[in-house]
């Protein structure tokens, strides 16, 4: 078995593309191996800051053989009246380098059918690797040189080998070779003797090509530091992944910043050091002034440590200055400054947005029937929920939006419940009631406002993150078990920006509700479709979905779905629910009517308690009465008044079922 290697060497890759490249390499390698009929025991992909590629192990000597078929002339054209080949057939065979032995007859035509022997793997791999490299997609490709080529970054070298043999491959005007390059400024060219020794060869040039091995190396160095220092480092997965993405030979750097900066709020210190210097802060019960960073290359000299310390101290000094200046300005005054900050040109300033958030929050409090004293707390929190955006610290460190609002509010002696909500309302899973109310109000205002001015997300583009905001609204409603009308809330929010609730906006929320049920709650596709019309009251839709999901697999409920389908199909084009029981001629009509009234009362009471499982149990009581009705009553009679009256009566049953879900989808599933 053989081993193949592809390495593409480029200028420094953006860390933001790291996971995308990794995923694409894995998926496209598998696709191309299948397309080129090459089996591989394992596929190892690697991505570094200056290279990416793939190692294919346990490759066969050749492609798999395949049977080639080609359609030829019709039989009446291919043979004469004596059954001998005509010139048409002979020409077809000659052009395809085939003989009569390869001919088969099917569906009135001549077909060539022959086994094509697979090519040697070294002849196949160049095309496979070329397709792999050129098949990757990037958000922001760039051109270089004469502008002829476009890629994520300029490509400087290509290594393509099978075992110890260099493959004949050319991409971007570069011919493949066995020469790679080590860490910039620390190692020059590196000759790869064969594919199996790729990783060990690169290590000599201070390059750990495998991202998995780099991550392991980072964690080992952190473990060693903790044992040596008796301090702890929080394993921040996001930061670790970023370090792995931007380095090829990560070596630990341990330094200290001035202890006076420990007087700053911990969030400021961590943000300044983590987000802006990609460093960890060591803990020893509490935050210490020791930081851990990672330098790319060999063991860093002392001047590198000093450089890190100088930069971090300067960053923290700036943060201290901004923080002290902010403490001189109350949140109320910061809020006034929002009048000078544009939220969106057509939607006014951030101050305007805050005013809308207050109104939507108040409406939500009314819908939830919250006491006036609590509503007042909500409105106080809403009035300052964006104030810290005008602060100097948030201007410098946008990641601290909301966090600084909480800190400043507590410093001013503002109620802790209100202060916490300022930060909490930004969360995708708010932990407080006030934060949840503000979170819904803020997101609804953003979504409605963007739809009002034409910023509508598509399947591929959502620059304002409206889909995620809608998902969070559903998540908050479910967590708090709030039985509210989202439709009414959207209508109210729309009026605040001079907009009318549109079909486009309704379709958007219905679509997000469907995805939320499937992706977050694990609801099956058919059940999600069955309750999708209930998105306007999300909690009811969610509870209905969970109840239907639970019972839809039980045999005793399959009859219920069939009964509903009979009613639904005959009434789907009928709108009226007004009927006169005096017009009923048959006993089965009267029996179903009486049972309907009995069941309806019980179902409505169950739904009032949000008990959808109980409601479904009551609905099943209708099944035998529905069967008797359809067995003995002909609905579509010629007499107009009887026909319309019967349809209108059945429409009542249909609408009662629809309050729980459109079970026709579940009927279809049960019949699969």
Swiss-Prot record:
Gene Ontology process terms (BP): arginyl-tRNA aminoacylation; glycyl-tRNA aminoacylation
Domain of life: Bacteria
Pfam families: DALR_1, tRNA_synt_2f
InterPro entries listed in its UniProt record: DALR_anticod-bd (IPR008909), Gly-tRNA-synth_bsu (IPR015944), Gly-tRNA-synth_heterodimer (IPR006194), tRNAsynth_Ia_anticodon-bd (IPR009080)
GO cellular component: cytosol
UniProt keyword list: Aminoacyl-tRNA synthetase, ATP-binding, Cytoplasm, Ligase, Nucleotide-binding, Protein biosynthesis
Catalytic activity: tRNA(Gly) + glycine + ATP = glycyl-tRNA(Gly) + AMP + diphosphate
GO molecular function: arginine-tRNA ligase activity; ATP binding; glycine-tRNA ligase activity
Compartments in which it is found: Cytoplasm
This enzyme's EC code(s): 6.1.1.14
Transmembrane segments: none
NCBIfam families: glyS
Assembly information from the UniProt record: Tetramer of two alpha and two beta subunits.
Family note: Belongs to the class-II aminoacyl-tRNA synthetase family.
Protein name: Glycine--tRNA ligase beta subunit
Phylogenetic classification of the source organism: Bacteria, Thermotogati, Thermotogota, Thermotogae, Thermotogales
């Amino acid at each position: 078995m053989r081993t193949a290697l592809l390495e593409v060497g480029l200028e420094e890759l953006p860390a933001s593309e790291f996971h995308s490249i990794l995923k694409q390499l894995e998926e496209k390698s598998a696709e191309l191996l299948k397309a080129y009929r090459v089996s591989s025991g394992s596929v190892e992909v690697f991505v570094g800051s200056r290279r990416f590629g793939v190692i294919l192990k346990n490759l066969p000597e050749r492609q798999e053989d395949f049977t080639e078929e080609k359609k030829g002339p019709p039989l009446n054209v291919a043979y004469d009246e004596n059954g001998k080949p005509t010139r048409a057939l002979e020409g077809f065979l000659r052009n395809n380098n085939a003989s009569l032995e390869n001919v088969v007859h099917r569906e009135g035509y001549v077909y060539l059918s022959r086994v094509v022997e697979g090519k040697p793997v070294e002849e196949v791999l160049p095309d496979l690797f070329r397709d792999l490299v050129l098949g990757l997609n990037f958000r922001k490709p760039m051109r270089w040189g004469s502008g002829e080529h476009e890629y994520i970054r300029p490509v400087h070298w290509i290594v393509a080998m099978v075992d110890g043999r260099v493959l004949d491959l050319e991409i971007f005007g570069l011919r493949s070779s066995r020469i790679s390059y080590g860490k910039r400024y620390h190692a020059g060219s590196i000759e790869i003797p064969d594919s199996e020794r790729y990783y060990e060869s690169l290590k000599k040039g201070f390059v750990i090509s495998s991202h998995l091995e780099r991550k392991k190396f980072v964690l080992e160095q952190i473990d060693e530091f903790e044992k040596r220092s008796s301090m702890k480092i929080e394993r921040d997965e996001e930061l670790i992944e970023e370090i792995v993405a931007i380095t090829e030979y990560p070596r630990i750097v341990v330094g200290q910043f001035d202890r006076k900066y420990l007087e700053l709020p911990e969030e400021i210190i961590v943000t300044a050091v983590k987000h802006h210097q990609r460093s960890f802060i060591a803990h020893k019960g509490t935050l210490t002034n020791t930081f851990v960073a990672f330098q790319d290359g060999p063991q860093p000299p002392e001047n590198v440590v000093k450089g890190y310390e100088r930069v971090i101290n300067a960053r923290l000094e700036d943060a201290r200055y901004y923080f002290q200046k902010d403490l001189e300005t109350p949140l109320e005054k910061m809020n006034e400054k929002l009048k000078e900050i544009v939220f969106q040109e057509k939607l006014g300033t951030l101050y305007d947005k805050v005013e809308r958030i207050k109104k939507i929050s108040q409406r939500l409090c009314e819908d939830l029937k919250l006491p006036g004293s609590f509503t007042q707390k909500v409105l106080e929190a809403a009035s300052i929920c964006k104030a810290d955006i005008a602060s100097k610290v948030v201007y410098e460190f946008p990641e601290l939006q909301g966090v600084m609002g909480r800190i400043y509010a507590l410093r001013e002696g503002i109620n802790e419940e209100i202060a916490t909500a300022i930060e909490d309302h930004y969360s995708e899973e708010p932990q407080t009631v006030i934060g949840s109310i503000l979170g819904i109000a803020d997101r609804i205002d953003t979504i409605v406002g963007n739809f009002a001015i034409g910023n509508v997300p598509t399947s591929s583009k959502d620059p304002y993150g409206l889909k995620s905001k809608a998902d969070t609204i559903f998540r908050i409603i479910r967590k708090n078990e709030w039985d509210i009308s989202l439709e009414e809330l959207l209508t109210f929010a729309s009026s605040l920006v001079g907009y009318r609730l549109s079909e486009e906006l309704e379709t958007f929320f219905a679509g997000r509700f469907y995805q939320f049920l499937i992706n977050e709650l694990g609801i099956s596709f058919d059940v999600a479709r069955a309750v999708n019309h209930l998105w306007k009251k999300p909690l009811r839709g969610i509870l209905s979905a969970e109840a239907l999901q639970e019972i839809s697999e039980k045999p005793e409920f399959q009859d219920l779905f069939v009964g509903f389908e009979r009613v639904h199909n005959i009434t789907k084009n009928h709108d009226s629910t007004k009927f006169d029981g005096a017009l009923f001629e048959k006993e089965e009509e009267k029996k179903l009517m009486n049972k309907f009234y009995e069941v309806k009362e019980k179902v409505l009471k169950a739904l009032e308690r949000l008990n959808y499982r109980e409601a479904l149990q009551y609905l099943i009581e209708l099944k035998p009465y529905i069967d008797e009705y359809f067995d003995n009553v002909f609905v579509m009679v010629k007499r107009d008044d009887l026909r319309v009256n019967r349809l209108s009566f059945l429409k009542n049953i249909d609408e009662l079922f629809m309050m729980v879900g459109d079970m026709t989808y579940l009927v279809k599933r049960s019949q699969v």
